[in-house]
Amino acid sequence: LKILVVIPVFNESKHILKCLQSFYEQSYKNIDWILVNDSSTDNSKEIIEEFIKDKPTFGLTNLINSSEHVPGAKVVKTFYAGLNSVNWKQYDVLVKLDADIILPENYFELIVNELQNNPKIGIIGGLVYIKKGNQWVYENISNKNHVRGPIKTYRKECFIDIGGLRMTLGWDNLDILLARMHHWEVKVLKNLFVKHLKPTAYVYQETKSRKLGEYFYNIGLSKKLAFISCAKSSWKEKSLRHFIISFKTFISLEKEKKERVITQEEMNFIRKFRWNEMIKKFKR
């Protein structure tokens, strides 16, 4: 299988060299790498240029004055700048990696084995670990059956079926829901760990709550589903304020009829899927 890896980069000079080294040392070699420098203001560009100058499977695309500030949209836009810089349809597997990720040497070897053994797998990845003290521990911001945004691997046919990545907050959950809609399997290799050098930022609680409400709107939840989902999240957070802000955000977006990046058919599937998942959990 021929792999194309696209890595959006913004001000990663502190980590990028270690990450590049781990990419270059992959035991699986049928990989092309494209780094997309999204107008970095540090010396990320120079570090990348120096590293890749004698490595023909690595390429660099530079974006000038990127001005997209919509959460979620910026990274997807940067990803597409790299993807569309080549004829990506000649590849079998498409990957979006963050620029602060260190891969174990056999990462893509194990990924390819799984894809070859099971043609139904559409999205696959390992688990993301962060450093706490002297130990690497699971970055516990999603369940262990979810392929995280920093390490997305898509079978090309699945990527095409889901209409690629959507430029919206929540793109990295939407892709998985749409893959299920098109009868693709999603697999997490729980014995395969990657190191996340710059843990996912913890924003102010109010911003986090607003983003959750926006995410529920973006993926097409109904008012009832959003109410239950916001309530469940606020129960976990032990915060009534979290519920009020997230649900209020959802309602205000619904009132202004903000445009979504999904079709009615996709929305109907997502609502049905979420209800079914909720009922399954309730029955346990």
Predicted features by range, described:
Residues 208-284:
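Non-catalytic, C-terminal membrane-associated alpha-helical segments of glycosyltransferases
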Residues 76-93:
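Active-site nucleotide-sugar/metal-binding loop of Leloir-type enzymes
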Residues 67, 102-138:
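Conserved donor NDP-sugar-binding/catalytic core segment of glycosyltransferases
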Residues 148-163:
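Conserved nucleotide-sugar donor-binding
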Residues 2-4, 32, 174:
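Cell-envelope/extracellular polymer assembly enzymes that use nucleotide-activated donors
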Residues 37-46, 66, 101:
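A conserved acidic beta->alpha catalytic loop
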Residues 21-30:
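Short, acidic, metal-binding catalytic loop of nucleotide-sugar glycosyltransferases
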Residues 90-102:
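Short beta-strand-to-loop acidic/aromatic patch adjacent to the donor-nucleotide binding site
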